């Protein structure tokens, strides 16, 4: 137990920030090398992670993201208005704050409305909120699930049915659970998928590229935020999904933060989040011990 606490402290204690890859989503899927321009901001009491792109204009990028207060040790969901040319944070607007930690604000678009479904592991579960961009406010729509799912995604990419996908803690849980809902929003089917390489946890929303469907997944084999795995997703006639790895994304250079666990894209803008360990040299030794000698086990 003591070794586990020490490992978590040196490997997982870090501050996240949002980044913008210099390559298109299509290029990333095809394995192109890339660098990342980081969000510029002056906040020292908080960090930002789990970005989803809300809107893109000629001048601005609007993001919904986890806004983590270092002193409260709790996240809320905020709207980040980013200057597109400089990637400077122009405005930070809280949009959803509850007594429990919130993160991973999955965006769901239905007709002309925008909804968000943030992770809320220790609250009432996964709640869908209608987001009003004019007032930057959220109205509770419904509780989608009371299951304590991490980094859950709600999607209708498979047609009339909606699908909820998520994992249970710990972060390296190898099982992805899916819940399928009919047009009346009634649950009609549950399934599970085991990932031996511990890439079950979502890293963002499904996306299409070159006519194919992909899922960004988290690589959690050795530690939280190890990298992102892009998986092509297919579906058979019974509704069963299949996941095929096509590429892996990790910190592009040694001069940039070494962790990455979210990727999303909308209207040609792709975002990730990245972080560096507070104790990088010790963390490197700890990871090698876990990898080669199995001294530290989760």
Placement of each model-derived feature along the sequence:
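Carbohydrate-active catalytic/glycan-binding domains of CAZyme proteins
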Residues: 1-298
């Amino acid at each position: 137990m003591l070794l586990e606490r020490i490992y978590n402290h040196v490997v997982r204690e870090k501050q996240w920030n949002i980044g913008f890859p210099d390559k298109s989503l299509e290029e990333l899927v095809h394995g192109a090398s890339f660098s990342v321009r980081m969000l510029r901001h002056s906040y020292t009491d908080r960090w930002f992670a789990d970005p989803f792109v809300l809107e893109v204009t000629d001048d601005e990028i609007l993001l919904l993201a986890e806004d983590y207060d270092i002193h409260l040790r709790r996240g809320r969901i905020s709207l980040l208005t980013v200057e597109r040319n400089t990637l400077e944070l122009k405005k930070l607007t809280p949009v959803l704050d509850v007594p429990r930690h919130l993160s991973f604000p999955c965006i769901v678009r239905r007709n002309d409305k925008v909804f968000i479904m943030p992770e809320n592991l220790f609250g009432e579960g996964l709640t869908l909120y209608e987001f009003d961009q004019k007032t930057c406010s959220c109205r509770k729509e419904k509780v989608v699930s009371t299951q304590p799912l991490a980094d859950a995604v709600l999607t209708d990419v498979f047609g009339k049915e909606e699908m909820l996908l998520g994992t249970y803690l710990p972060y390296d849980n190898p099982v992805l659970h899916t819940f399928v809902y009919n047009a009346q929003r009634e649950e009609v089917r549950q399934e599970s998928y085991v990932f031996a390489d511990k890439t079950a946890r979502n890293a963002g929303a499904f996306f299409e590229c070159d006519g194919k469907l992909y899922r960004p997944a988290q690589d959690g084999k050795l530690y939280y935020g190890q990298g992102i795995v892009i998986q092509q997703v297919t579906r058979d006639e019974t509704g069963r999904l299949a996941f095929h790895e096509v590429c892996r994304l990790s910190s592009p250079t040694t001069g940039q933060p070494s962790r990455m666990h979210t990727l999303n894209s909308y209207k040609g803008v792709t975002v990730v989040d990245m972080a560096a360990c507070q104790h990088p040299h010790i963390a490197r030794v700890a990871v090698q011990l876990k990898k080669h000698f199995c001294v530290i086990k989760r």
